[in-house]
């Protein structure tokens, strides 16, 4: 409590929506961290970055592949700047992402001029994101997990809000059913897992395949080259971030054959 005192609250059912470091999730499945399905990210805010507009920039920089470097407009002349990489890849490459981020900003030929007069206006923050490429248990006796607590981040785009909203909607429905039936057992709440993963598992599997393909440098260079020279190819590739059918195509060898012939 604000005054430093402790209070205990009890309920018939808990919906864990307490984020990446969820205490509720730890009670359900322990302090689980799977390096293959966890993304590590570092971020800071900068003012005075040159060339900013309303575009969300994602750059695949060789020094941190298969990770990426981003520059996002944050309003009021600020930029959200950071790097992200799957934990397993980071450990395998024995790379310090914080040093890599500062190196890209200060030394990389593509970016050092853009940051020449920029100022870092926040500390560098670090966090980990549990990716939805691993089908985790998201229920237990009297407990449902939603959002980042459930580990639903898209492994390709890093986006988690859409799946978080869906999980909240499904959890509310199952919670209502459980309370109406007077049954909050794990067996009853298992329907939440079934419904949630039934909705999102195929798309997350496709995103995971796309993430892995993005780590193949020559293939990524080929795709980017095609996007630069062909409006049709550019439209097809950008669609993979938002369109389920486009994601299916991206994960298929035929997609690259079409790009090659375009």
What kind of feature is each model-predicted range?
Residues 19-22, 44, 70, 80, ...:
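Short, flexible micro-motifs
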Residues 91-174, 180:
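FAD/FMN-dependent oxidoreductases across multiple families
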Residues 176-262:
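C-terminal helical "tail/cap" subdomain of flavin- and related membrane-associated enzymes
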Residues 51, 63-65, 69, 79, ...:
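Short capping/connector residues at structural and topological boundaries
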Residues 18-19, 169, 217, 231:
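Alpha-helix N-cap/helix-start capping motif
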Residues 59-64, 88-90, 106-108, 116-122, ...:
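A general structural signal for short secondary-structure boundary/capping elements
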Residues 1-117, 130:
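Predominantly flavin-linked oxidoreductase catalytic cores and closely associated redox partners
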């Amino acid at each position: 409590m604000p005054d430093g005192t402790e209070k205990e609250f009890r309920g018939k059912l808990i919906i864990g929506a307490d984020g990446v470091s969820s205490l509720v999730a730890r009670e359900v499945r322990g302090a689980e961290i799977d390096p293959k399905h966890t993304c590590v990210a570092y971020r800071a805010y900068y003012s005075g970055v040159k060339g900013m507009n309303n575009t969300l920039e994602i750059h695949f920089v060789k020094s941190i592949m298969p990770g990426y470097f981003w520059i996002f407009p944050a309003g009021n002349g600020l930029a959200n700047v950071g790097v992200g990489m799957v934990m397993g890849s980071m450990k395998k490459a024995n790379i310090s992402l914080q040093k890599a981020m500062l190196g890209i900003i200060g030394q990389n030929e593509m970016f050092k001029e853009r940051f020449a007069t920029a100022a870092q206006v926040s500390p560098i923050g670090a966090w980990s994101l549990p990716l939805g490429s691993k089908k985790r248990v998201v229920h237990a006796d009297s407990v449902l997990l939603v959002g980042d607590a459930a580990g639903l981040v898209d492994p390709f785009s890093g986006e988690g809000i859409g799946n978080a909203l869906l999980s909240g909607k499904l959890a509310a429905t199952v919670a209502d059913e459980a309370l109406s039936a007077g049954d909050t057992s794990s067996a009853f709440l298992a329907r939440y897992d079934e419904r949630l993963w039934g909705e999102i598992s195929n798309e997350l599997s496709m995103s995971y395949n796309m993430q892995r393909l993005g780590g193949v440098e020559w293939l990524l260079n080929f795709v980017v080259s095609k996007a630069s020279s062909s409006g049709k190819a550019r439209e097809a590739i950008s669609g993979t971030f938002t369109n389920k059918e486009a994601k299916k195509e991206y994960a298929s060898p035929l997609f690259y054959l079409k790009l090659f012939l375009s």
